[in-house]
């Protein structure tokens, strides 16, 4: 009922007659929390700070030494080659998929950082990054970016069921909390 709708005298008396004898209930089950009023400036600063944290590890100038023969693969020092083999065979099933088709490099870098941050927050150890084949720009850059991130234990070209040559399976280290 809007504010412009007015009750006639008959309707008002009928309502009073219907609720006569009822008691007002005291609300005691829900405690209202005061809302946090963030200014737009504070929200922008927070999102900018989070974005920088997610993008921090990826440099286009640093080129890690990766194996160039055969499918793309990488294992950090101390990670068993058996883990890479399990990635290759599809033993690890990715819980998160990032589709980079149509993204520019900066956008792809930002989304990759966001995906890794999300996986760490949600304790997800395996993810799939679908860079596509196209002009090979993202196909070349994604492994270089992944190798720079300290939480990436290993990655391997995905098996056909998860994207084949157009995707990479990433194994992340989940810190104990």
Curated annotation (Swiss-Prot):
The lineage of its organism: Bacteria, Pseudomonadati, Pseudomonadota, Gammaproteobacteria, Vibrionales. Residues 98-173 form the Smr domain. Keywords: Endonuclease, Hydrolase, Nuclease, RNA-binding, rRNA-binding. It is an enzyme of class 3 (hydrolase). Residues 30-41 have a biased composition (Polar residues). One of its GO terms (molecular function) is RNA endonuclease activity. Associates with collided ribosomes, but not with correctly translating polysomes. One of its GO terms (biological process) is rescue of stalled ribosome. Coiled coil: none annotated. This is Ribosome rescue factor SmrB.
């Amino acid at each position: 009922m809007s504010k412009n709708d007015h009750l006639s005298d008959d309707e008002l008396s009928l309502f009073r007659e219907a609720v006569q004898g009822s008691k007002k209930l005291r609300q005691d089950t829900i405690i209202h929390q005061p809302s946090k009023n963030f200014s737009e400036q504070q929200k922008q600063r927070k999102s900018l700070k989070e974005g920088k944290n997610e993008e921090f590890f990826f440099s286009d100038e640093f080129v890690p030494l990766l194996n160039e023969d055969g499918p793309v693969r990488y294992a950090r020092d101390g990670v068993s080659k058996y883990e890479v083999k399990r990635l290759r065979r599809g033993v690890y099933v990715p819980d998160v998929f990032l589709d980079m088709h149509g993204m520019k490099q900066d956008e792809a870098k930002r989304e990759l950082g966001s995906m890794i941050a999300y996986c760490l927050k949600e304790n997800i150890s395996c993810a799939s990054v679908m860079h596509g084949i196209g002009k090979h720009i993202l196909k070349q850059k994604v492994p270089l970016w992944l190798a720079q991130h300290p939480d990436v234990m290993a990655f391997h070209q995905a098996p056909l069921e998860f994207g084949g040559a157009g995707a990479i399976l990433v194994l992340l280290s989940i810190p104990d909390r």
